[in-house]
Amino acid sequence: MARRKKKQAPWRRWLRRFVIVVLGFVAVSFLLVLPLRWVAPVTTAFMLQDDSGRDPLMYEWVDWPQLGERLALAVVASEDQRFADHFGLDVAAIRKSIDEKDDRGYLRGASTISQQTVKNIFLWPGRSFARKGLEAWLTVVAEICLPKRRILEIYLNVAEFGPGIYGAGAASRYYYGSSPDRLTDAQAALLASVLPNPRRLRVDNPSDYVRERQAWVISQMQRLRREGWISRLSP
């Protein structure tokens, strides 16, 4: 007489399904992010959702050597000076930015460059806990899969610098008729000063706040340059 197969407890079945779903989610996450180590994104989620009215959107990929040190330093100075030190999430900086929110209502530094990169490429605008949680997870995956210099290279190429203007290459040519590696400190600092809200803060019509921010970014660029900051990025 054949032995009857012992019936599996329902909780074990649900646990097995849960583990399969989690492992599948992890695998898909790495499959999405890892190719960015070698392949430039053709488009991003933010570009696909763009409602600026610009048609076609302005976007061109520029490799790291042609991006230039000035713009890299300017963006790091403006957005994430601890970029080389943290693992994608900088809780201390988030708390500090909330405490130092100025009287104009501008909130700076709430997201690291790594977070902004994965948000622009894979996600959608919004502040829901689900989106923030997914952003945090993909940021960790990006930090595992990609060197710091590659993350910064991608960010400089996909960040929006004006309505429908994506990446340093398109922004440099549109605003200055130049390639990114030929920008002056002042030009690079002005581009960086409108991040991460280029619809409200404008390069072509800078407010007093943007000009103040530009001057501060220039001073921070000079400090980072003296410290040899760029040399800290692994290729």
Where is each model-derived feature located?
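Juxtamembrane regions of bacterial inner-membrane/periplasmic proteins
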Residues: 2-235
